[in-house]
């Protein structure tokens, strides 16, 4: 069978998608050992894991770009799961970092706006996971700020306010939530080892995020098949009979 004939006779193979939407903690998640890379590894031949992390972004900017990332009529199925992972920049102190700071009330409104938009493009709440920012190690981040010639521009207590607001939005909307801020500080443990510079994740922090996020993702994708046949199951004489079906596993 000529290649053009094979292509014409086979049904299009649509890869389901998991969308990771967030700030630098998402952008960096595809680095070696990152939580996003670990998700992609777990979902090989089941889903494409798309990294849509934008370093330095807050929810004010995120809600503007979201319709450019997910829309109806794009020729792609809607994502089977979406993580929304903001707050680390929104919670920056207004006096020290006014550009990234977003007031708490606006942060809540922006999260709700993104959830509403996703619902409008056929991504229901049951596919969403809202992730709180991790706790801030003020001592380590203060050193980072000092090296950049600025004062400490975030406080862990303030980050906690944004984390609690994120959880409330998830509860109100019926979405899943991952409370990193609380989990990393559970029982008063030293959480500094989860962070590379007081704000961003260390290798141990990436492992922590993956271990807690995977169960939430898994229940949303557990019914998805392994795409295309196992190589031993491909018909030897006429492989097209095995390979030009409906993406059966």
Swiss-Prot record:
Q: Which residues form the active site?
A: 24, 197, 200
Any one Pfam family match given in the protein's UniProt record, by short name: Lipase_GDSL
**What is this protein's function?**
Probable lipase.
Site feature Transition state stabilizer: at which residues? 56, 89
Full protein name: Isoamyl acetate-hydrolyzing esterase 1 homolog
Q: Name one GO biological process term.
A: lipid catabolic process
Supply the PANTHER family for this chain: ISOAMYL ACETATE-HYDROLYZING ESTERASE 1, ISOAMYL ACETATE-HYDROLYZING ESTERASE 1 HOMOLOG
Q: Which family is annotated? A: Belongs to the 'GDSL' lipolytic enzyme family. IAH1 subfamily.
* Annotated source species: Bos taurus (Bovine)
Q: What class of enzyme is it?
A: hydrolase
- What keywords appear on the UniProt entry? Hydrolase, Lipid degradation, Lipid metabolism
Residues with the modification N6-succinyllysine, per the entry, are 63
């Amino acid at each position: 069978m000529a290649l053009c004939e094979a292509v014409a006779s086979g049904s299009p193979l649509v890869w389901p998608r998991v969308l990771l939407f967030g700030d630098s903690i998402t952008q960096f998640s595809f680095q070696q050992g990152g939580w996003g890379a670990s998700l992609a590894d777990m979902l090989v031949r089941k889903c494409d894991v798309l990294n849509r992390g934008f370093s330095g972004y807050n929810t004010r900017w995120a809600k503007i770009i979201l319709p450019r990332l997910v829309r109806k009529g794009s020729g792609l199925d809607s994502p089977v799961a979406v993580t929304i992972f903001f707050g680390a920049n929104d919670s920056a102190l207004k006096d020290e970092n006014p550009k990234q700071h977003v007031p708490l009330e606006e942060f809540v409104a922006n999260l709700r706006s993104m959830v509403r938009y996703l619902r409008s493009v056929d991504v229901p709440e049951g596919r969403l996971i809202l992730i709180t920012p991790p706790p801030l190690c003020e001592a380590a981040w203060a050193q980072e700020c000092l090296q950049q010639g600025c004062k400490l521009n975030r406080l862990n207590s303030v980050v906690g306010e944004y984390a609690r607001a994120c959880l409330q939005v998830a509860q109100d909307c019926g979405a899943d939530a991952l409370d990193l801020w609380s989990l990393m500080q559970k029982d008063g443990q030293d959480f500094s080892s989860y962070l590379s510079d007081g704000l961003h994740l260390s290798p141990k922090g990436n492992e922590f995020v993956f271990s807690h996020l995977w169960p939430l993702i898994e229940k949303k994708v557990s019914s998805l098949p392994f795409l295309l046949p196992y190589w031993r199951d491909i018909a030897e004489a006429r492989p097209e009979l095995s390979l030009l079906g409906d993406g059966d596993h």
